[in-house]
Amino acid sequence: MEEGNVVRDTNRIFGVDIDNITEKEAQDITKELIEKSNKSCTFIASPNVEFVMHAQKDKEFFDILKKAKLSTPDSIGIIWAGKKLKKPFKIRIPGQRYFRLVLEMAEKEGYTVYLLGGKGDTPRLAKENVEKIYPKVKIIGYHEGYFEQDSEEEVIEEINKLKPNILFVALGAPKQEKWIIQHQKELKVDVAAGQGGTYDYEAGNIKRAPIWIQKIGMEWFWRLLKQPSRIVRMMAIPKFMLKLFFTKDITKSKWEK
């Protein structure tokens, strides 16, 4: 897949392009996007199985994912799809891991960060906790995600006043991705990336699965045990696996002729 003069190494999974990159490459590409953006709000995504399956029934979301200039592989199901394509992904980069990688890079480069999303004190607690890990990172603002439509302009105005290099948006998918694209021309940020439930983990609201569970790709099951309300969303995983197993050409989407 070619973006301008840059050829991206991607795997196409049911029409969704996902970058085949290492963690270091994810940092380097993000840095390059920031440097070239000039406050044009370059969109970054972290597609997982739920994203891919939702995109099969939501054309707007499918088209939005096509706009991402970087898409990190964020679930074990995506990794398995790469193996079926006989082009294995180099590594799985979950959303929270990408969040940490970017903060690490931002601390080193002096980039500024804004956290949008989460409930109540969650973004503040997430900010305080990650600042203990990255003491020199410049998180210059935050705002919880349960704002009313009439206060949305105030939120955007605050972000634009600060002009952060990096905007993380944690409103849940597909809302966060749609929100970024809806306001892409208004937002004076260099890059914007959806972050789902990352703030909850960073704030300590939800405990991450033990490392051994993460390594075997069963973190989704751990999350289901901790959050039974996610069961409807989690049904996307077995549906994806069946689709993966029974579909001969897994690169195509029903939206593409």
Model features per residue range: what roles?
Residues 77-82, 209-257:
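A transmembrane-helix-recognition feature enriched in membrane-embedded lipid enzymes
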Residues 159-169, 173, 189:
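Proline-aspartate-enriched helix->loop->beta-strand connector
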Residues 144-150, 190-226:
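Short, flexible loop segments at boundaries between secondary-structure elements
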Residues 59, 63-67, 177-195:
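A short, gly/pro- and small-residue-rich
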Residues 48-52, 171-176, 198:
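Short glycine-rich anion-binding loops that position phosphate/pyrophosphate groups of nucleotides
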Residues 2-91:
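N-terminal nucleotide/polyanion-binding subdomain common to many enzyme families
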Residues 79-158, 162:
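Conserved beta-alpha
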